[in-house]
Amino acid sequence: MARFLQTLLFLVIMVEFVSRRVEAWGSPQIVRPFEDIPKSYVYVQHALWYAMKEYNKASNDLYNFRVVDILKSQEQITDSLEYYLEVNIARTMCKKIAGDNENCLFQQDPKMKKMVFCIFIVSSKPWKFELKMLKKQCKDI
């Protein structure tokens, strides 16, 4: 646990250092390119929560969508932590007015079922509590 905290502290210090350097020069530099990381990683889950919140907010569908499967998760370090996510999402039984869709069941009626493949890139600065959608590309499957 101590090793994990040391690594996390080092990462935060490095990102902050790079962040200041990038702000000085005006263009983010890639400190570490995208690498595969575990789907269960806390920041992947946080980025995915944000991506789905933004997807549902922008969608014209009457129902919320929720993640069915995470196909790929990667992290890149620039002036922030960037998460590349490939996911399958599906329409739930919860209408948007219901709010939170964490516990919503997926549509069972064949006429209402809808599955979508999405690629999201989310920028995160956890030390500033900032999240930003850099890319959202989705298509029906």
Swiss-Prot record:
User: A Pfam family in this protein?
Assistant: Cystatin
Residue numbers marked as site, Reactive site: 26
GO CC term (a single one)? cytoplasm
What InterPro entries does this protein's entry cite?
Cystatin_dom, Cystatin_sf, Sperm_Mat_Cystatin
Where in this protein does the record put region Secondary area of contact? 76-80
Question: What is known about the tissue distribution of this protein?
Answer: Expressed exclusively in testis. Found in spermatagonia, spermatocytes, round spermatids, elongating spermatids and spermatozoa.
Looking up Gene3D superfamilies in the UniProt record yields: 3.10.450.10
Protein's UniProt keywords contain Metal-binding:
no
Major location (coarse): secreted
Molecular function via GO? cysteine-type endopeptidase inhibitor activity
Q: List the disulfide bonds.
A: 94-104, 118-138
Tell me the protein family, please: Belongs to the cystatin family.
UniProt xrefs under PANTHER family: CYSTATIN-13, CYSTATIN-8-RELATED
Q: What does this protein do?
A: May perform a specialized role during sperm development and maturation.
Specify the protein name: Cystatin-13
Gene from which the chain derives: Cst13
